[in-house]
Each structure stands twice: as structure tokens, then as C-alpha cells.
Amino acid sequence: MQQHTLHIAGGVARNPLVRLSNPVTLDFLDGEHIAIVGPNGAGRSLLVDLLTGKYPLRDGVLTYDFRPSATQTAYDNIKYIAFRDTYGSADANYYYQQRWNAHDQEDAPLVRELLGEVKNEALRQQLFGLFRIEPMLDKKIILLSSGELRKFQLTKTLLTAPRILIMDNPFIGLDAATRELLFNVLEKLAQLASLQIVLVLSMLDDVPSFITHVVPVENGVVGEKMERAAYLRTFRERDAIRVEADAASFGELQQRIMDLPYENTNFTSDEVVRLNKVSIRYDDRTILKELDWTVMRGQKWALSGENGAGKSTLLSLVCADNPQSYACDISLFGRKRGTGESIWEIKKHIGYVSPEMHRAYLKNLPAIEIVASGLHDSIGLYKRPHAGQMAVCEWWMDVFGVAGLKDKPFLQLSSGEQRLALLARAFVKDPELLILDEPLHGLDTYNRRRVKKIIEAFCARRDKTMIMVTHYENELPATISDRLYLKRNR
């Protein structure tokens, strides 16, 4: 009889706030590698929490068989890592702008210190060799590239020798080369007889070839486990039908945005951004070296490059978040930095969303207040908007498909729903300059198409300027007019 590493039958959470729509019945068999897939807000994370025993059951049964593990507790044998962006999950000590402040980097621990003492020397050697950890040991954790950090996080988790490893969005924020590296590493891990891999994904493209089965989740309903090939075939057929159906509604959505009135009373300069021989260093590493770059009003830039090339650092200069900008020759909206302007005078022109902002913005306010904070560029809502401003906030939430969540606490939204709310926040003041750093992070196929259409319509309006970062070429809107590719300084 085949070993059932995990078995749940008729499972219903005791707490009604975390229940899925239907009772859950599901089996994970030894040798299977599973992908849990579904749209934003479908219930994927709730399913994982149920399977890992986080929520006690009101009805049903949940059992495990972790052989050959020496222990049989879920705590020892199931490890869960959720990746929200390039740099992992938010933590309580993280704050916006932390990456750009040198004194925070000085206090950051080394990789060696975080890995600690390893009791199983054979396992340590195997993992350090697989992930090439040795060259990273004396680096500060906050200065790791995204690929290095992903390898560190996996190594630290795997050193506990789990029987089941669950990873939520493991490929998020990675460039093509780093995604391929991670694919290859996971493929090697999948060959270990003692490890079962479960991936929680929102993008069909991220289902690797070593995955044997797929569990679909939609509207809180957990579907039947399917073989990978059968699921992909079914999904593509359904998606082709939906693309046709969405075309008309997306057209109407774009027209609503195109019909917005022209308002450009905040600045008159044709030059939006100018960098002259700008260099940025952290410790002994040069991030940007003598960079010249000019962005003119109405241009739409695609900013690209491998992980660690300095894209987010460059955007931090444009957004007035990086203290090193005062020592550089930088002009924003026609004014040279350091000539008396406040950061708020700069930010009032900018609508911005980024992984760093998402990590820092863990405020348990109603979602509409998160959107409203974009009117004043604050992390949190400290100035009460008037009724007209709140109506504008709700309008943009409707555009992004999350108006129905306006009163729901932000931290109770799924990661994808949070991203949509933060996108509405970036657009809410109808900014002259839109800065989108990986805006489609964690969004499902439908919402990625929807947001791309919104960006295209917004950028087609008079005098709108945009800078967008993405590692997926197919995410770029058709309105892109210029490109800047950054190479990593080795």
C-alpha cells in the first residue's frame, strides 16, 4: 500500500473566519510533488494553513505519515516558506527605506551567524555544496542578492531535515537566470527520496516540470488533485475562452481611465529625471557607477537588468528615499536635489509601488484607508480625507477590482489583493510620474492582464510619464517608448 504522507478527509476549520467554502478531502502520496494553484483570494493560503495543522478541525480528520523521519510531529516535518517579493517575507523589524540606510546595514547579521551551528555535518556539506553557500557565509544578510537570499532561506530551512517542504511563490521577483537556477536546484531536491515538495503558485508559467500533480483552488473550493499534464491542458482551454470574454470588459475599463480630465498643474519642466555621473556604493560594493540618465515628460521607460544590478537603488534615488542622493548630481522635476526642496514636494508628483513598500506596509487599516494614504504619501493614514477624496479612492479600487474589499482590514487580504490595493494607492492622486517596481508581483493570470491594460490606458493620457521594472518581458505595456538595462557591477 502506498504511503500517504498527508491525508485529510472532510476537513473543516473550527474557526469560521478561516474556513474554506467546502470541506477538504485530499491525499499527498509519497513520491508526489504538488503544486497548489489558483487566483488571488481563492484560498490557497487557507488550504496550506489547514494542511499544516495551524487551524484545529471542527469536522473531519487530518493524519500524517512522515516515515522515514524519526519524529512524527507536523512541527518537525512540515516547513513552510512564503516569499512575498525579491527579499522574502516581511518581518517585524523591517521598515521602508531600510535598504538604503548605511547604519542599518552595519547592524545586519552575517549569513554565518544566522545559519548557526549545524549538528548534521553530512547534511550541511550536501546543502552547502548544492546551494554554493561557502562564498556567502561572511556577507551581511541585508546585502545579499535576491538569488543568494533565496538560496540562504532554503538552506536554513532544509538544515532542519523536513519531510515536506512548502514554498509559497518561490520564483517571485527573480530574474530569468536566477529563476532557472532555482528551477534546477528544486529539481535536484525533488530527487531526494526523503523530501516532498509543495509549491503554492499564482502563475501557470511557474509550475516546474518536476511537479507531478496539481491541486486547483478557486472561490474557496479545493478541487480534485490532477496530474500535471491534464491540469495544464484544462487550464489553457479555459483561459483561452476567458481571454475572449475579458476583451470587451477591459476595453470599457480602459475607456473610463482615458476619459479622466487632464490635470497637470504641479510642474512645468519637460525634464522629469536627470542623473549626471551618479555612483552609489555600499561597503566595498559599487551598485551604480557613473550613471547618466534623463527621463523626459511623456516617456515610458522599461528599466531592466539582473537581480542586484541596482534597479531598486536607482528608483530609490528618483523617489527621494535614498540618503545618498544628496551627494549626487540629481535633478527631479527640474530642481536639483539639495536646493531646499522637501521630499514631500518631490513625492507629490509620483505614484509608486514596489516590493519594499509592500513589505513595510503591514498596517491593519481598512483597505480603502491604505489607498487613501497615497494622497499624502504616508505609510498609514494621518490626515482624514474628505468625502470627495474617499470617492476617488473607491473609484480606483473599483478599477483594480477590489472595491468590494474596501472595508476589510488590509492584513486579512491575500497577498495578491494587497498588491491590487497598493496599486490603487499608486494611481489615486493621478500622478505625473508613475513608478512601478514589479507591479504584477504575486498576481494571477487574470489580474496580470487587467493591471497591464490599466497601465496602458493610464500611460496613453497626455503628459503621463512612467518607469517600470519587471523580469518578465510579456508584462511590459504596449506604451513603452524607451529602455534602460543595468548590468551588475561584479
Regions found by a protein language model. Give the residues of each.
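The feature captures the beta-strand-to-loop junction immediately N-terminal to the Walker
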Residues: V37-P39, S304-E306
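ABC ATPase nucleotide-binding domain signature region
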Residues: L46-N120, L315-I379
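Conserved ABC ATPase "signature" region
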Residues: K119-M136, A387-L405
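Conserved ABC ATPase signature
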Residues: K140-L144, E148, Y382-P385, P409-L413, ...
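Hydrophobic anchor residue at the start of the ABC signature
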Residues: Q153-L154, L423
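Catalytic Walker B motif of ABC-type/P-loop ATPase nucleotide-binding domains
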Residues: L165-N169, L434-E438
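Conserved beta-strand-loop-alpha-helix hinge in the C-terminal portion
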Residues: V217-G251, P477-A478, L486-R490
